[in-house]
């Protein structure tokens, strides 16, 4: 199996992945030769509520990997002996794969580091899909609404679009099997599969139900969206993946063609991605030979610099960056660089604050180890880990847009005291219901408002915040957040 190749190139530089034989346990340790320097491929990642996204970077390493000392060798021998004993002598037959995974998980857990983890072959595949933006499927965005799986929209030119799938189509079966009661991610997994294989969707459109056969293909999800809002160009960057820099460049050129001078780069809830893309993206606005990020391990520091001239069409643009607490990793690298060079003004709320770096090692069986190895700093030397980047101008996110999802396995009623009850109160207030406090107490006044909510949405009126009420509550808050972007609207008004 070949390593996934992470490259960084420009007109006069080309990065190549070279296989290292220094690590006998791994299929290959990723190495990059860039001009006369030797780098290793590393990852900066962040863990948010629902996902882990990583970022590729490059760091100069002077030292060779050292051999094991006597103590290390003794410990390794002990681990090997325990594995052999339990695998062969334990009175119940053991799964050797599970034993080895448990041993690795135990070592990683001992680090007490949320950014270090061991990924199985399947998890590694998803990890790589997230970094590349490529997956095999039909190219249809879906959502769960009213306990139904509904197509939000088929991607332009996708197999789903060519097969006639339309927005608001309800999927009832996948390959003849009902999906009733299944979670959205389970349905997505069923729809995806191997390239050039077929999947049959049973689709309900109005009163009509029919089967649609669709051939799965490799799909690339774009990471950049551009739209014109009055005299302001809004460029939304969802993550930093392969060729995000190219997509950003295209968006900037479109804005220039539209005659726009004021540009908003929306990085809210962008959890990160490839660092070499972040460097290339910064290079669109920052001239050649400037440091974008500093990588530090012990006493060793390496400055990662831009390699091209800035894009001439971007030089006269007034750049604003919009961030929030979900902007992390590569988002912070990019924002920190433009802020340090006074190339952009930062708006919104404080960023996540992720300033450590992970290295990945992939094993022969396709599994992967990710562990923290170093930290990164902005060009001016700011270490933002645990602190985040403070905006130049604060625009607070409405409370309801920052709420955690309430578990639908619990029912809340009068007399209960729980942190989720505060979330219920904030959410109901945002939806127009009268709530006079934001405590964690489920009081009589809240019961009355829950009853009003249930009645308005044709649910069983009990006054208890149960699973059905929770699902509708979450659905309406998501719809409200998608329809009304108060923070972006405030920023555009500031820029007028």
UniProtKB/Swiss-Prot annotation:
The UniProt GO MF terms for this protein read:
endopeptidase activity; serine-type peptidase activity
* UniProt entry tagged with the keyword Ion transport: no
GO CC, sorted alphabetically, is: outer membrane-bounded periplasmic space; plasma membrane
Enumerate the transmembrane spans: 39-59
Chief place where the protein resides: membrane
- Domain of life, per UniProt, equals Bacteria
Q: What keywords would UniProt list here? A: Cell membrane, Hydrolase, Membrane, Protease, Serine protease, Transmembrane, Transmembrane helix
Residue stretches making up the PDZ domain: 124-206
Record GO biological process: proteolysis; signal transduction
Q: Which region ranges are annotated with the description Disordered?
A: 1-27
**Where located?**
Cell membrane
Q: Where is the composition biased (Polar residues)?
A: 18-27
Entry keyword Transport: no
Active site, renumbered: 329 (charge relay system), 340 (charge relay system), 354 (charge relay system)
Instruction: Give the CDD domains listed for this entry.
Output: cpPDZ_CPP-like (cd06782), Peptidase_S41_CPP (cd07560)
What is the E.C. number? Answer: 3.4.21.-
Per UniProt, the ranges with Basic and acidic residues bias are 1-16
Which PANTHER family does this UniProt record tie to the protein?
CARBOXY-TERMINAL PROCESSING PROTEASE CTPA, TAIL-SPECIFIC PROTEASE
Q: Please give the family membership noted in the entry.
A: Belongs to the peptidase S41A family.
Q: In its UniProt entry, what is this protein called?
A: Probable CtpA-like serine protease
């Amino acid at each position: 199996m070949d390593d996934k190749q992470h490259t960084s190139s420009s007109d006069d530089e080309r990065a190549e992945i070279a296989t290292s034989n220094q690590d006998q346990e791994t299929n290959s340790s990723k190495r990059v030769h860039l001009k006369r320097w030797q780098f290793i491929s590393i990852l900066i990642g962040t863990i948010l509520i629902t996902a882990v996204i990583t970022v590729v970077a490059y760091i100069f390493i002077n030292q060779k990997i050292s051999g094991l000392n006597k103590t290390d060798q003794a410990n390794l021998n002990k681990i090997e002996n325990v594995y052999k004993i339990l695998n062969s002598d334990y009175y119940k037959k053991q799964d050797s794969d599970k034993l080895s995974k448990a041993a690795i998980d135990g070592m990683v857990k001992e680090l007490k580091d949320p950014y270090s983890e061991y990924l199985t072959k399947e998890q590694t595949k998803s990890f790589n899909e997230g970094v590349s933006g490529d997956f095999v499927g039909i190219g249809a965005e879906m959502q769960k609404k009213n306990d139904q799986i509904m197509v939000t929209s088929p991607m332009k030119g996708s197999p789903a679009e060519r097969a006639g799938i339309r927005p608001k189509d309800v999927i009832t079966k996948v390959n003849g099997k009902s999906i009733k009661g299944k979670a959205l991610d389970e349905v997505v997994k069923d729809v995806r599969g191997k390239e050039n294989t077929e999947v049959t969707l049973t689709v309900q459109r109005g009163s009509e139900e029919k089967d649609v056969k669709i051939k799965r293909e490799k799909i690339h999800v774009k990471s950049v969206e551009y739209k014109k809002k009055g005299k302001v160009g809004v460029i939304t960057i969802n993550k930093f993946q392969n060729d995000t820099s190219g997509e950003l460049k295209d968006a900037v050129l479109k804005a220039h063609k539209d005659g726009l001078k004021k540009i908003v780069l929306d990085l809210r809830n962008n959890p990160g991605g490839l660092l070499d893309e972040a460097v290339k993206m910064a290079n669109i606005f920052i001239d050649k030979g400037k440091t974008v990020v500093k990588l530090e391990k012990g006493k060793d520091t390496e400055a990662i610099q831009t390699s091209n001239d800035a894009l001439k069409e971007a030089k006269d643009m007034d750049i604003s960056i919009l961030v929030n607490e979900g902007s992390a990793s590569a988002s912070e690298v990019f924002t920190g660089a433009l802020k340090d060079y006074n190339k952009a003004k930062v708006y919104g709320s404080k960023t996540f604050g992720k300033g450590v770096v992970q290295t990945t090692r992939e094993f022969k069986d396709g599994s992967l180890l990710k562990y923290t190895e170093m930290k990164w700093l902005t060009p001016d030397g700011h270490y933002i880990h645990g602190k985040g980047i403070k905006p130049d101008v604060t625009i607070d996110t409405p409370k309801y847009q920052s709420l955690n999802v309430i578990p639908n396995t619990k029912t809340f009623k009068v007399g209960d005291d729980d942190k989720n009850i505060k979330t219920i109160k904030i959410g109901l207030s945002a939806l127009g219901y009268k709530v006079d406090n934001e405590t964690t107490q489920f009081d009589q006044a809240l019961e009355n408002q829950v009853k009003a909510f249930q009645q308005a949405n044709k649910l069983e009126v009990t006054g208890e915040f149960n699973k059905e009420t929770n699902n509708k509550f979450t659905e309406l808050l998501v719809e409200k957040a998608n329809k009304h972007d108060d923070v972006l609207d405030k920023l555009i008004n500031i820029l007028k």
